[in-house]
Regions:
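Active-site-proximal specificity loops/subdomain of glycosyltransferases
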Residues: 37-103, 111, 115-124
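Conserved catalytic core of nucleotide-sugar-dependent glycosyltransferases
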Residues: 85-226, 231
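N-proximal low-complexity "stem/linker" segments adjacent to membrane-targeting elements
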Residues: 1-18
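Short loop->beta transition adjacent to catalytic acidic/histidine clusters or analogous donor-positioning motifs
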Residues: 2-7, 27-36, 48, 75
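Short, well-formed alpha-helical segments that are part of the catalytic scaffolds
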Residues: 15-29
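C-terminal catalytic/acceptor-binding lobe
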Residues: 165-317
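Gly/Ser/Thr-rich loops at beta-strand to alpha-helix junctions
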Residues: 14-16, 80-86, 242
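Structural alpha-beta junctions
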Residues: 27-38, 72, 98-112, 228-229, ...
């Protein structure tokens, strides 16, 4: 692969400006080109973009800030949330090699048809309904590829779309969400779709760590903006936008698996693994590591782990 030039995009979902010195401390010597995307930033500047979306719609952050960070000399853009701790051995010189990415290849944790998750993950059904409703207010012609064209593109990547989204233990899942009113509402909204397919072939994927090759960045930012305008949840908006804009896409998990749960097989069992703390049992093996002082924690970071997420960097300030 030819010489790379990386732009690291640090994504904030909230105005946590007190974390900026920690970002500099952790990554200043590892990535020469850093850009901050922060909602309502107090002091925007050449390397800090002030953006205006809710965290659940962070695809809009990318679209709003694109003109600030896109440069012709960059070969890749790496998205790193402010609460994600990237393996300290990874830097701008080795990240593409460590991820074993081919020329022009992007990276995301996983990809699955959102309709396949319609009755097991609340935001899949919500996104299907929201897309149809929001699309009535936006003329999407020329803004997104036609639905059938996008579906064929995704199927050529290996994505499998269900013939008819159907419920499985649906009401038990709703009952298991007694305190999450928005989640219960999303499930009930899903039920109102009566098994109809999404009007657009949306994908779902864990979107907190991404690599976007430069040839795709303009299209990716544009599609992210369209999805934000449609009010599509980020972990559906971003993977859909990335798969629409990138011809080759590598995933950590096998295609057609969701990121929640430990049963999903990894596409490359010998590659680096991302660790997300969804439940207490996910966090427990790393509790001692994260309780150490920052320098000691960095020195003993597991070699086979790509990142830990989420991690409160303010704990190490």
């Amino acid at each position: 692969m030819s010489q790379t030039k990386i732009c690291a995009l640090f994504m904030f979902n909230h105005r946590f400006e007190r974390n900026l010195p920690m970002i500099e401390r952790l990554y200043g010597n590892r990535f020469s080109h850093r850009h901050i995307l922060m909602p309502f930033a107090t002091n925007p500047g050449p390397n800090i973009s002030r953006v205006y979306e809710l965290g659940r719609n962070f695809s809009g952050h990318i679209a709003q800030a694109a003109r600030d960070f896109i440069r012709e000399d960059f070969t890749h853009y790496v998205v790193i949330p402010d609460d994600l701790l990237l393996n300290p051995d990874i830097n701008e010189k080795n990240i593409i090699e460590r991820l074993n990415l081919r020329e022009g290849e992007g990276y995301i944790n996983n990809l699955i048809a959102a309709d396949a998750l319609r009755y097991s993950w609340p935001w899949a059904g919500e996104a299907a309904g929201t897309f149809g409703r929001s699309a009535q207010a936006i003329d999407l012609k020329g803004l997104l590829p036609p639905a059938e064209e996008a579906k064929v593109r995704f199927e050529n990547m290996g994505i499998v779309f269900p013939s008819s989204p159907g419920p499985a233990n649906f009401f038990k899942r709703i009952a298991a969400q007694p305190k999450a009113a928005r989640t219960r509402w999303a499930y009930l909204y899903t039920l109102s779709l009566l098994g109809r397919k999404s009007p657009y072939p949306l994908l779902a994927g864990y979107s907190d760590f991404l690599v976007i090759p430069a040839p795709a960045i303009d299209r990716f930012a544009h599609y992210c903006g369209v999805m934000a305008a449609l009010n599509i949840f980020a972990e559906i908006a971003v993977p859909t936008a990335l798969a629409l804009s990138t011809d080759r896409l590598k995933t950590e998990l096998e295609l057609n698996w969701h990121f929640v749960g430990s049963a999903a097989p990894r596409a490359d069992p010998t590659g680096l693994k991302g660790v997300a703390f969804w439940k207490e049992e996910d966090f427990r093996p790393y509790a001692e590591l994260l309780a150490r002082p920052l320098d000691e924690m960095i020195a003993t970071f597991p070699e086979d782990v790509l990142y830990l997420h989420p991690v409160k960097l303010s704990n190490y300030a």
